[in-house]
Regions:
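N-terminal leader/targeting and pre-domain segments
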Residues: 1-17
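Structural alpha-helical scaffold elements that stabilize or flank donor/cofactor-binding regions
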Residues: 11-13, 62, 67
Length: 68
């Protein structure tokens, strides 16, 4: 699931499940390599954990706030 700055608090801090946040950028090679792994983990842990992705180029407020 892709999220933005406005949805971050609700999707992450108010989630009833543990959340893994993938902060990524389109220009980031390692991010592109990790994306399919995150997608597989999301399937494997469905119902037990939540996986969200945030494009840091499109959403700078949250990464700046948390030093990412």
């Amino acid at each position: 699931m892709n999220i933005n700055d406005d949805a971050f608090e609700n999707e992450v801090f108010k989630s009833l499940l543990p959340v893994v946040v993938d902060f990524w950028a389109p220009w980031c090679g390692p991010c592109k390599m990790l994306s399919p792994v995150i997608d597989e983990l999301e399937k494997e842990f469905a119902g037990r954990a939540k996986f969200v992705k945030m494009n840091i180029d499109d959403n700078s407020r949250t990464p700046t706030k948390y030093g990412i």
